[in-house]
């Protein structure tokens, strides 16, 4: 059996097990990860590279930074301030999505989610609303906000690099032509109808995320220092390019400072790390690597696009590229999906004599629609434990958002980015 066939079988297995959830998501990920090594598809180093991925380091760091915000009671304090202004659950959802969406446009969407997850859990605790109903809109807004600027998500820069090789480019805010209407439509959806689809779980955490602790004995300096370090970490992430320090390192410095200064103990810091998230993310990265290395991902893309024939309608091609990227991104990382599809889309556009910017915009926006699974993008994975989510929660809440993004994109793309200008 060829490596690509084995990879596709593992992909099918993962999808089935993620949907059924007969065994924990993290265990399924590890079965796939180890299975790819045992079958010889990947070597050990490649299969387990996901566990030293920069996003895993960012996860661990921000779990500790978030843990400190809880341990000191500062998350509850912030939650109290926000809930004074947002009186209803729907107002809270709108406020969270607007703040996260805008921040995600200039920050990494993963970084934005990592910083604000503990704050939102604090808001949930203070307001009495269930965190499972607030965290999912947060990560969806982070994904949508990534399409507001050139630096909002890695996939945006991948497409830009490909265009620069043929002396073309996207403007800094050009993605927002499609991205901003999608963000507005998404917020309106969850404010009116979509909030009914959000999961309604009672989640009780232990350790650093226990929001019902008595914080009266916590020194005030610890509360403020936890917030100051969070803000400094956030600023370091915003100015990542200027200071030359990667997101994960900024997070690591913040986490270390909190432990060294005694704001959070080593024991509580370790307790705040959600290992379920680490195993789920690290394990599924091996599947993404196998899809790329064996050519299985390219095979899927090639078969679908090849079925359209030699001279497909530009509108049909835009739709197919968008949907294909939207499907792939929910099982591979959104960055890997864009990296896989950009060269394929570019060659098709050039073969048709079409404007490559139109096809690549569809590719990037479709590749950002990682709403329907917990593994589509790192932020989705980060809230699995905190929100008590199951695989089908993402499908139920996120799939309508893919439909909305598709409809909005199919209206705007042919107008703003015509194939034959």
Each predicted region: which residue ranges?
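Transmembrane alpha-helix interface/packing and boundary motifs in multi-pass membrane proteins
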Residues: 14-23, 99-108, 140-151, 236-242, ...
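Generic hydrophobic alpha-helical scaffold/packing signal
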Residues: 145, 232, 257-258, 267-270, ...
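Alpha-helix N-cap/start motif
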Residues: 44, 90, 131, 172, ...
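Hydrophobic transmembrane alpha-helices of multi-pass small-molecule transporters
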Residues: 1-60, 64, 177-302, 318, ...
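Juxtamembrane and boundary regions of transmembrane helices in multi-pass small-molecule transporters
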Residues: 6, 91, 127-140, 146-158, ...
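Membrane-embedded alpha-helical segments and adjacent helix-loop junctions characteristic
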Residues: 13, 27, 32-34, 38-130, ...
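Glycine-centered helix-boundary capping/hinge motifs
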Residues: 21, 40, 73, 128, ...
